[in-house]
UniProtKB/Swiss-Prot annotation:
Lineage per the UniProt record: Bacteria, Bacillati, Bacillota, Bacilli, Lactobacillales
Known role: The UvrABC repair system catalyzes the recognition and processing of DNA lesions. A damage recognition complex composed of 2 UvrA and 2 UvrB subunits scans DNA for abnormalities. Upon binding of the UvrA(2)B(2) complex to a putative damaged site, the DNA wraps around one UvrB monomer. DNA wrap is dependent on ATP binding by UvrB and probably causes local melting of the DNA helix, facilitating insertion of UvrB beta-hairpin between the DNA strands. Then UvrB probes one DNA strand for the presence of a lesion.
Protease in keyword set: no
Keyword set includes DNA damage: yes
Compartments reported by the entry: Cytoplasm
Residue ranges of every copy of the Helicase C-terminal domain listed in the record: 435-601
Encoding gene, per UniProt annotation: uvrB
Family: Belongs to the UvrB family.
PANTHER family: UVRABC SYSTEM PROTEIN B (PTHR24029:SF0)
Domain of life, source organism: Bacteria
Motif position, Beta-hairpin: 97-120
Protein name as annotated: UvrABC system protein B
Length: 662
């Protein structure tokens, strides 16, 4: 049984008060939500404090909230901001837990089968479990997610029904508890104690929940009765306190009980027989043999272990769904009356709409060639209309809402005034003749004032050539391309802010979510080449990159002024006029945003210093090793707090290496 607390209130903590046009935006959004309006748009210019407005709305309507961003970087930024605004509430993070993911696929032209290959990030997996367990235990929950939240996740009912509920005085034998833990995919390991594992020492069972990373629980028995339950530090065993109730959630989201498993296996076998008959009738003997061998192996694993690699491909049978019925997703873990906020909706909605088709075409190939049963097609993302059916109330948040959002609602709430008084930048158009030398002069002027420059090009070659040329001219410049990993991208942005280099060149990486107040110049090359990157919305987003600096200026290099350029220039001028009038009326002088540079790499340097010392861990005594483990654990937590999970995993491995010597 789960103790679900429903009377928690969101408590917003901030040293700021709503200002500019934030108060009216907050009031309108809240009134519309409380009035039952299903959809509305918050059209907030860059730098107007949309996240703060979202936080104010969440605290006032007091509903569990799902915030969807279109990539992990943005989700990470939002997660950090919401954690600061709501330190006493459950702010959770739910993104794909793969560091690396190669989906299962088959290429008929070369008869190549590509087996699923992936590397799961343990820290993100922990955060996903933390999100689902929080949703079932309390109502004051904000989950910041990427679009992976519309992928199949397993039945929330099975997940909740499988919870092992413990309290002092409960009559249950130690062996029964051990069996219950194994049933929900916990693993016994008396030596390497990690998330999703338990260990046994006489009448004491220690359990490490899948949603925790440092605290475990010690269940002490007296005969066949639980005597007491203590929360302990997993690493040191130090007792932190006693608890009167403990809910242990499954170690995997794909979980089912024995009765349902037998029914599911029977359905899998029946489907296998049907599909084998189809293949044999069509003379596809190789495909039939392939399917029979693979499926029978999976069935055996499900019978013996309750789990198999690729178990999600059988989720339709395990969940008891009909063919074509949508899968369970994170959205099903929310109560009926919840709020969805879609950040940068002009980008995120496109992803939600496109996920299903890409997944379907790949899976059909696997089914047609005997690598998977047809039911694997129902392990999929939601279709757009299925996502819409989950929507109770939704707020689309964007500086440039797309056509879809505008079709869903006519309620558009503008947020144009920046609390800092900053204006939208001035935009000018210059000819392409001599543009590179002209731009070089502008960059040098910014470098002298310790300001930064963004340059956006249309092609990779242009970006590379431009970067090489500016380097030859003595400019400190970097090119950010699409192959750069998320963590490296974050480091590049930080180095730009610190002045390690002055100019960043990119193609489609500079439009939203990159927050660099030091940038005073944005140069848009080939601004008159109509297309996805040079349409009205794309240009407005790019212009917005210079809106966090009081000296913000945008130069479009073009030989003609396209309709998209003109509309973007006109909209920027309209906003600038409103902002100037507000500043004049209230005596506000625009100030460049002073934003703390979060030291994402501080922990890396700390570890590097430790490594530089070349400590021979074999030469350390037990007390010194214990102190080193404590130091590493602290560094690991610091890495997790800034979402540097790759580094956290490296530190964890170092810790295990040290602990293995004891």
């Amino acid at each position: 049984m789960i103790n679900h607390i429903t009377d928690n209130q969101f408590k917003l903590v901030s040293k700021y008060q709503p200002s500019g046009d934030q108060p009216q935006a907050i009031e309108q959004l809240v009134d519309n939500i409380e009035g039952g309006e299903k959809a509305q748009i918050l059209m907030g210019a860059t730098g107007t404090g949309k996240t703060y407005t979202m936080s104010q709305v969440i605290s006032k309507v007091n509903k569990p909230t799902l915030v969807i961003a279109h990539n992990k970087t943005l989700a990470g930024q939002l997660y950090g901001e919401f954690k600061e605004f709501f330190p006493e509430n459950a702010v959770e993070y739910f993104v794909s837990y793969y560091d690396y993911y190669q989906p299962e696929a088959y290429v008929p032209s070369s008869d190549t089968y590509i087996e699923k290959d992936s590397s799961v990030n343990d820290e993100i997996d922990k955060l996903r479990h933390s999100a689902t367990s929080a949703l079932l235990e309390r109502n004051d929950v904000i989950v910041v997610a990427s679009v992976s939240c519309i992928y199949g996740l397993g039945s929330p009912k099975e997940y909740a029904d499988s919870v092992v509920s413990l309290r002092p005085g409960l009559e249950i034998s130690r062996d029964k508890l051990l069996n219950d833990l194994v049933d929900i995919q916990f693993e016994r390991n008396d030596i390497d104690f990690q998330r999703g594992r338990f260990r046994v020492r006489g009448d004491v069972v220690e359990i490490f929940p899948a949603s925790r990373d440092e605290h475990a629980f010690r269940v002490e028995f007296f005969g066949d009765e639980i005597d007491r339950i203590r929360e302990v530090e997993a690493l040191t065993g130090q007792v932190l306190g006693e608890v009167d109730h403990l809910a242990i959630f499954p170690a995997t989201h794909f979980v089912t009980n024995d009765d349902h498993m037998e029914v599911a296996i029977a359905k899998i076998q029946a489907e296998l027989e049907e599909q084998l008959a189809v293949f044999e009738k069509e003379g596809k003997l190789l495909e039939a043999q392939r399917l029979k061998q693979r499926t029978e192996y999976d069935i055996e694993m499900l019978r013996e272990m309750g789990y198999t690699n690729g178990v999600e491909n059988y989720s339709r049978h395990m969940d008891g769904r009909s063919e074509g019925e949508p899968p369970y997703t994170l959205l099903d873990f929310f109560p009926d009356d919840f709020l969805i906020m879609i950040d940068e909706s002009h980008m995120t909605i496109g992803q939600i709409k496109g996920m299903y088709n890409g997944d379907r075409s790949r899976k059909e190939m696997l089914v047609n060639y005997g690598f998977r049963l047809p039911s694997a097609l129902d392990n999929r993302p939601l279709r757009r209309e299925e996502f819409e059916s989950h929507v109770h109330q939704i707020v689309y948040v964007s500086a440039t809402p797309g056509d879809y959002e505008n079709e869903q609602t006519e309620t558009v709430i503008e947020q144009i005034i920046r609390p800092t008084g900053l204006l939208d930048p001035e935009v000018e158009v210059r000819p392409t003749m001599g543009q590179i030398d002209d731009l070089l002069g502008e960059i040098n002027a910014r470098v002298e004032k310790n300001e930064r420059t963004f340059i956006t090009t249309l092609t990779k070659k242009m970006a590379e050539d431009l970067t090489d040329y500016f380097k030859e001219m003595g400019i400190k410049v970097k090119y950010m391309h699409s192959d750069i990993k998320t963590l490296e991208r974050t480091e590049i942005i930080r180095d730009l802010r610190l002045g390690v280099f002055d100019v960043l060149v990119g193609i489609n990486l500079l439009r939203e979510g990159i927050d660099v107040p030091e940038v005073s110049l944005v140069a848009i090359l080939d601004a008159d080449k109509e297309g996805f990157l040079r349409n009205e919305r794309g240009l407005i987003q790019t212009i917005g990159r210079a809106a966090r600096n009081s000296e913000g200026h945008v130069i479009m290099y073009a030989d003609t002024v396209t309709q998209s350029m003109q509309r973007a220039i006109d909209e920027t001028a309209r906003r600038r006029k409103i902002q100037m009038a507000y500043n004049e009326e209230h005596g506000i002088v625009p100030q460049t945003i002073k934003k703390e540079i979060r030291d994402l790499i501080a922990v890396t340097k700390a570890v590097a210093k430790e490594e530089d010392k070349e400590v021979d861990i074999n030469s350390l005594n037990k007390q010194e090793r214990k102190e080193l483990v404590k130091k590493l654990e602290k560094q690991m937590q610091e890495a997790v707090e800034v979402l540097d999970f790759e580094l956290a995993a490296q530190i964890r491995d170092m810790m295990l290496e040290v602990k293995a010597l004891d």
